[in-house]
Amino acid sequence: MMRIALFLLTNLAVMVVFGLVLSLTGIQSSSVQGLMIMALLFGFGGSFVSLLMSKWMALRSVGGEVIEQPRNERERWLVNTVATQARQAGIAMPQVAIYHAPDINAFATGARRDASLVAVSTGLLQNMSPDEAEAVIAHEISHIANGDMVTMTLIQGVVNTFVIFISRILAQLAAGFMGGNRDDGEESNGNPLIYFAVATVLELVFGILASIITMWFSRHREFHADAGSAKLVGREKMIAALQRLKTSYEPQEATSMMAFCINGKSKSLSELFMTHPPLDKRIEALRTGEYLK
């Protein structure tokens, strides 16, 4: 969840900055083809900037510290576990980081399979058994081995392209309609302030709506990462880890879902914006072996 949230926030910020620069400098495409090229460049540009910054952003956001040399038995176990699983998964040894937080959490990120990072919280190491922690680490290793961050970047790039393209087409129409035609009979792009305001608002709104697509992909890949963990360390260990998460977080999640859904009943709507499937669904998928085939 951490890596996806940071990726999307950074990506959205880059898109907004690009849009501001274009609008303030008066750079507008005069043709649909030109606008599409611009949307492709900036849409994928935002995604790849987010990907390249992902390790730095993730570590900075949680105050994580990369383990260069293990200082105690716990760090030694963590590094050895990551090394063993990386070797089993056929990827290069990721950087290993630890950060101080009471919650049970871990994430993996990085621009390439062979230049990745796995970070775990102190809460995970303190509150999970070695088998459960091993399963969570294997889950993150599976994300790296599956190339999920790169695939997410490509999907987000396509989504960004359409968000920018459609937003600016509609902004040009709105600016032209509200700005009227020029007296000399030449075609006008309309009021630039209207264009700037409409384009910015539409990019934000469409960006949030488009996140439904990326959230769906994220949930889908979580099932595959769970299956990858089961293959590396065993199905029962991964199920035990998810059950531990369920007992640790379910009461808090119920409260937050009520706030989000207003009446606390419309869980299906809230799931559209979740990066992870409900824990019960993940446990059931492991038990049935749906993604282990």
UniProtKB/Swiss-Prot annotation:
Positions bound to Zn(2+): 139, 143, 222
Molecular function, one GO term: metalloendopeptidase activity
CDD domains given in the database record: M48B_HtpX_like
InterPro entries the record matches: HtpX_protease (IPR050083), Pept_M48_protease_HtpX (IPR022919), Peptidase_M48 (IPR001915)
Cofactor: Zn(2+)
Gene Ontology biological process terms, A to Z: proteolysis
EC class name: hydrolase
Entry's cofactor comment: Binds 1 zinc ion per subunit.
GO annotation, cellular component aspect: plasma membrane
Membrane topology: Multi-pass membrane protein
Superkingdom of origin: Bacteria
Protein name in UniProt: Protease HtpX
Gene that this sequence comes from: htpX
